[in-house]
């Protein structure tokens, strides 16, 4: 029961950070989409918008709606790719809960950033191919026609995790409502969320060392650590259930930090979360009817095809397969030696670089 309570607190803390960004930025994150005029800027906007909103599922759903409203698919595709990178900020924040223990922090940080490394590599390979040959756009267009119909699914009723976390979310939001304006309550929520994560991850680490032994450890290793296919399937299944890859990766990072799973075992699991998160965009697309329904389904299919092709190409080729863990381990070693690398990495990749690129495009 203690583990369940701590996991609930962890998810509430992650949610508080997302809510804080939403409150602090208002509609500014959504307004960023208006600057998407070319593929590179679209990629940067998808990245920073997801980092601000703290939900690739939400961003994907917004993009689906914008495509239905007339946004060219060729611009929407880089937005989706950027959202894939931006969503990994959450698990990187969670890894900070191990910052006081050097070895644990190295393991947790590498487990969090292997997701970033894979998504960045996938973009570096597939975005140029998409700009020149349009394989995702063409393939998704062919699939969209097969899936567009009269049936639709209500995403809100399907997201039971949001319902479960609503009491904690409301309580945390109420605790900052006395602050003036929207900026300060938002900042306060972010600070509360990070503080909760630092406390909960430390507590989870201590508890897991005691409970994850014997049968419990064998069950976890059978579902996550038995092999790549099992790991990917588990990551996909859990993410489909909770409709949030951020939530799934946030749960697995403490397990890596405490040494219960190796980076080699975590890596395929995080790839599965990429597939699972596509369900939200697909559900959003089914809710759109009329002449734009097929376009909306097309961009949702792009999200799925991008993640599937990324896994087939990168994980399927041994040389490429080794690159994300190598990049993550190198970054984690640097971060363990000097925490300024953590600040530079998180601030630079998720905010400074994309905002500078967006600013330059407007000159």
PLM feature segments, named:
Residues 50-84, 99, 144-154, 158, ...:
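Membrane-interfacial helix-loop connectors
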Residues 27, 31-35, 71-72, 76, ...:
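Membrane-helix interfacial "entry" motifs
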Residues 8-12, 93-162, 195-202, 283-363:
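Juxtamembrane and boundary regions of transmembrane helices in multi-pass small-molecule transporters
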Residues 1-43, 47, 168-232:
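Helix-loop-helix hairpins and the membrane-proximal interhelical loops
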Residues 53, 57-61, 161-186, 273, ...:
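Long, highly hydrophobic alpha-helical transmembrane signal-anchor segments
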Residues 7, 11-19, 23, 42-43, ...:
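Transmembrane alpha-helical segments of multi-pass membrane transport proteins and ion-pumping complexes
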Residues 23-26, 62-65, 96-109, 205-217, ...:
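Juxtamembrane helix-loop transition segments at the membrane interface in multi-pass membrane proteins
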Residues 7, 34-38, 46, 50, ...:
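Alpha-helical transmembrane segments of multi-pass membrane proteins, especially transporters
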